[in-house]
């Protein structure tokens, strides 16, 4: 009996860079793309290659994810919380951790009833004073938590290099 063997590199020549289907990466309560539900193109041809994720993936704001940035002068976290009102969100600083919590009770939307809750924690960098951290909510549902970074004190100086005549590593004794 003959058994057909399908080699994965024929279908996905860039296997390490191939991302899994977004179907399993979705957040509950969010929409799916039509391409996530119907894989007709992949079943019609063994040579069909799905576009790389960086070409087809939406930005972080459309996926419900967060973005943490550490810039030269500030630390910031941007978090998509468009499904929550300001009263349903809490931002706390506990030691060197920022904790963001959002919760809304069950309510009806166009697909039925849904309730949501999330907890996110972010470590505050050592050069950010926890007392200076602020948060704001934009009109499009992006929560921004940020704080200024402490500036490095003292001016920059060049350290001269001296040359020594002896080796840094002593020679091993000969046998």
UniProtKB/Swiss-Prot annotation:
InterPro entries: A-crystallin/Hsp20_dom (IPR002068), ACD_alphaB-crystallin (IPR037882), Alpha-crystallin/HSP_16 (IPR055269), Alpha-crystallin/sHSP_animal (IPR001436), Alpha-crystallin_N (IPR003090), HSP20-like_chaperone (IPR008978). May contribute to the transparency and refractive index of the lens. Has chaperone-like activity, preventing aggregation of various proteins under a wide range of stress conditions. In lens epithelial cells, stabilizes the ATP6V1A protein, preventing its degradation by the proteasome. Zn(2+) 2 binds at residues 104, 106. Its main location: cytoplasm. It comes from the Eukaryota. Pfam families: Crystallin, HSP20. Residues 56-164 form the sHSP domain. Belongs to the small heat shock protein (HSP20) family. PROSITE patterns: SHSP. Induction: Induced by HSF4. Induced by calcineurin and transverse aortic constriction in ventricular tissue. One of its GO terms (molecular function) is unfolded protein binding. GO terms for cellular component: actin filament bundle; axon; cardiac myofibril; cell surface; contractile muscle fiber; cytosol; dendritic spine; extracellular region. Abundantly expressed in the lens of the eye. Expressed in ventricular cardiomyocytes of the heart. Also expressed in skeletal muscle and the kidney. The modification N6-acetyllysine is found at residues 92, 166. This is Alpha-crystallin B chain. The modification Phosphoserine is found at residues 19, 45, 59. It is found in: Cytoplasm, Cytosol; Nucleus; Secreted; Lysosome. One of its GO terms (biological process) is negative regulation of amyloid fibril formation. Heteromer composed of three CRYAA and one CRYAB subunits. Aggregates with homologous proteins, including the small heat shock protein HSPB1, to form large heteromeric complexes. Inter-subunit bridging via zinc ions enhances stability, which is crucial as there is no protein turn over in the lens. Interacts with HSPBAP1. Interacts with TTN/titin. Interacts with TMEM109; in the cellular response to DNA damage. Interacts with DES; binds rapidly during early stages of DES filament assembly and a reduced binding seen in the later stages. Residues 145-175 are annotated as: Disordered. The modification N-acetylmethionine is found at residue 1. Keywords: Acetylation, Chaperone, Cytoplasm, Eye lens protein, Lysosome, Metal-binding, Methylation, Nucleus, Phosphoprotein, Secreted, Zinc. The gene is Cryab. Zn(2+) 1 binds at residues 83, 111, 119.
